Amino acid sequence: MLLSDGNDNDYNDIEIADGLKKLTKGFNLSFTLHTFGYGEDYDPKIMSRLANLRDGSFYMIEQLDKVQDYFINALGGCMSVIYNEAKLKIKTLKNNVKIKKIFGMDKLYNYNLKDDYFETTLLQYISGKEYTFTIEVELPNVISINDNLFEVEFIGGEDNQKFNQICQYKIVGGAFSVADEEYLKSKVYDTIDIALKLKEENKNDEMNKKLNEMKNWINKNYEGINKNKYLKKINETLGLFQDNYIFESRGRSKITADIYENQLRRGGNFVYSNHMQCAMINQSKTNSGRSAPNPIPYFCNK
């Protein structure tokens, strides 16, 4: 766990990440790196890139009294690992079905993507944590809803105690579903990620155009209350971009943390999702006189 309250003014995020990658190459170690940015003077690009490198979480800490809560969330997760280096594999079962994009793919520890195949490694698969992958696929004009189109395989554990599960999936149609909202969320944060890069390159007109195009796309393709929170998020992001002082002091860090947590969902950075995390945060808050959160329903992986 790495906490920083200092800035790297030389913008060496890629060099630092590459250095850590070379340092750990050849070590037969399964470890996750969690990074914590505190205050206003630290570099969120470096902190998030280092976390991405080892499949960890990047935490933006805005209040001092939240530091122990974030550390507990990360530490409780490290103490609740079910599998080291679990693998997720997705392949298409039809020649004319293609995998076009995995949202947030650049934030994965590793991946292999082809038209008909996707594979990634989860360095530490944590009890109670939900992993959500949003995938954009290309389908033919005519397709049967009864056809199995994808096969998903999850592999975890050592060779002598390997857990292996294979599921096949069809197209699901109908009313607005969880999948629709996940796709909308992924599209929004993918756009915010692009807009952040444009802002850092001082391409403000292109940045504004990109975000406003996304607002128009949402209004055109989505109806009802579900879209409002994403329109609000885009407007909040535009507000953080407009004032350079706000952007430099906290906007960049907040936007980076939002992108990291939502573009590729790995359970959330501030969600106590298993018994260990709940017990540790309850004990911490009892000792400090703060109110403890309600226990979260927890289902043990059999």
Q: What is the predicted role of each segment?
A:
Residues D10:
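Catalytic P-loop NTPase motifs of RecA-like helicase/translocase cores
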Residues D5-G6:
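Active-site metal-binding loops of divalent metal-dependent hydrolases
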Residues T35-F36, L184:
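A generic structural signal for short
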